[in-house]
Curated annotation (Swiss-Prot):
GO terms for molecular function: ubiquitin protein ligase binding. It comes from the Eukaryota. InterPro entries: Cullin, Cullin_N, Cullin_repeat-like_dom_sf. One of its GO terms (biological process) is ubiquitin-dependent protein catabolic process. Belongs to the cullin family. PANTHER family: CULLIN (PTHR11932). This is Cullin-like protein 3. Signal peptide: none annotated. Transmembrane segments: none annotated. It comes from Arabidopsis thaliana.
Length: 255
């Protein structure tokens, strides 16, 4: 057994960092030997030694720093170079990869969660890891993502086919980055979508009055309601449905 005096934080952290690097390479799809039992035990042992004999707070801080650096140095550049649908696909992919990374990495450091964080009342490793994405990636990309989704919804309203699964996956990014609440979804996407919806149907109503017969005009609102219900079913959050129907589509009055 290694004596406490022989344990050095830098050595143990290097073992943990080595395992993290392998995880990153695996998630990035790079050629990498399997993340095997030996590596997992090495990370578990290093975590135990740091928590038992050294400075668990330092390990906690290093964990956050490592994930933040990955988000800033790898994830953000991959998103900044893409636009529109390509950017949306990358964002959804990166969010899913980040969740996987946090889950796998935090499991290797579970002793830190159990022996230190729970006693100190600090956020869990999972929470810290997910917050790194929210603070470093989501915060920068959410505005562009919302605009790209609204552009797709506009295309669909105009009769074009869109990738609804993609839209739903990116909507999940908004919802899940609320960390248990709908705050991000409501403030960063839904609010803009409702404004865009009102503007769209206000413009449409003006044209319908001029171009459609009285009978056709009275049928338009119900047709639009049905299509908006379908959008909620396929990719919007269920709580959006009543808000959509409260939107006054310009001069369209539901009689």
């Amino acid at each position: 057994m290694v004596a406490p005096t022989e344990i050095k934080f830098e050595v143990e952290w290097s073992n943990i960092q080595q395992g993290f690097t392998k995880l990153i390479r695996m998630i990035e799809g790079e050629s990498e030997p399997a993340f095997n039992q030996e590596i997992m035990m090495m990370m578990h042992t290093a975590t135990y030694r740091i928590c038992a004999y050294k400075n668990p707070q330092q390990l906690y801080d290093k964990y956050r720093e490592l994930i933040e650096n990955y988000a800033i140095q790898t994830v953000l550049p991959s998103l900044r170079e893409k636009h529109d649908e390509c950017m949306l696909r990358e964002l959804a992919k990166r969010w899913n990869a980040h969740k996987l990374l946090v889950r796998l990495f935090s499991r290797r450091l579970v002793y830190l969660d159990d022996s230190f964080l729970s006693k100190k009342g600090l956020p869990s490793l999972r929470e810290v890891g997910l917050n790194c994405f929210r603070d470093q990636v989501y915060r920068e990309m959410q505005s562009m993502a919302a605009e790209a989704i609204l552009a797709l919804i506009h295309k669909e309203r105009e009769g074009e086919q869109i990738d609804r699964e993609l839209v739903r996956n990116v909507i999940d990014v908004f919802v899940e980055n609320g960390m248990g609440t709908l705050k991000k979804y409501e403030e960063d996407f839904e609010r803009l979508m409702l404004q865009d919806t009102a503007s769209y149907y206000s413009s449409k109503a003006s044209r319908w009055i001029q171009e459609e017969s009285c009978l056709d005009y009275t049928l338009k609102p119900q047709q639009c309601l049905q299509r908006e219900r379908e959008r909620v079913t396929h990719y919007l959050h269920p709580t959006t449905e009543p808000k959509l129907f409260e939107v006054r589509y310009g001069i369209i009055i539901w009689n």
